[in-house]
Structure formats: C-alpha cells, structure tokens
Amino acid sequence: MSRITVVRLDRDALDLPLASEGGRVRALLWPGMGARERSLCYFDLPEGFASTEFRHPYEAVYYVVRGEGRVVDADSGTAHPVHAGQMIYLTPNQGYRLDGPAVFVGGPCPPDPSLFSEVL
C-alpha cells in the first residue's frame, strides 16, 4: 500500500541524544515511523557545539541548511569547512563529526540502527 507522510519538525520529530549539551538532533525520518530504506535527521549545532562521532557501515549525506560549520574526519582529525548550500558526502565506514555553528539535514542510507538504539 502506498502512502504519503508529511513530517513537521516542531511537532513530529524525535529528539536523539547525538550532540553535545546545547546542540540538538531530531529524527525526521527513521525506522520507528516505518522508514526502512532512508533516515533523515536535523542537526542544530550552535557555535562551539558538535555532534557525537559517527561511523556507519553505509553512505551518508548531509546538506548544510544554515551557517558555517565543519565536518571533521575522525581518523585524521582534518576539519573541512562547510557553509549553507553545500552538501557533504561520506563513504561507508568513514568516521566523522559535525561541528557548528550550522544546521545540517541528512544521515546514513539505509538507516543505521545504532542511531536509534535508545528509542527502538
């Protein structure tokens, strides 16, 4: 059966403990709502705040919605500056962290169950 689902960030998103205190990560699309092939998270990371470090067995992509942050290579420590309007592509098993001040939208595809382990 086909269906269309519209998700509102302010009402429907699920808070996830994936950022340092002061940052906020919210799942917009995740397995708990029936999504099996895709996940999408909203990262709001103010100046001085960061996501936790990730390493997925799948590809991941992020779009920078607002701000000028960084994506940090967890293996080398190299920081890559990013700004609104840019896309970040990460290969499978690439460790990384997102740093503010920026808003990022994205995640691994398919969903990485470890991101949702505390809520599933």
Locations of the language-model features?
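A short, N-terminal "cap"/entry segment at the start of jelly-roll beta-barrel domains
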Residues: 1-37, 52, 117-120
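Short, charged/polar surface micro-motifs in flexible loops or helix N-caps
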Residues: 33-37, 46-49, 66-70, 110-113
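A structure-centric signal for secondary-structure junctions around beta-strands
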Residues: 37-39, 58, 101
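Conserved hydrophobic/aromatic beta-strand scaffold that supports enzyme active sites
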Residues: 6, 27, 40-44, 61, ...
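Conserved short histidine dyad/triad with adjacent acidic residue
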Residues: 26, 39-56
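Ligand-binding loop in jelly-roll beta-barrel domains
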Residues: 83-86, 92-117
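A short beta-strand-loop-beta hairpin characteristic of the jelly-roll/cupin
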Residues: 54-84
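Histidine-centered metal-chelating micro-motifs
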Residues: 49-52, 70, 77-78, 86-97
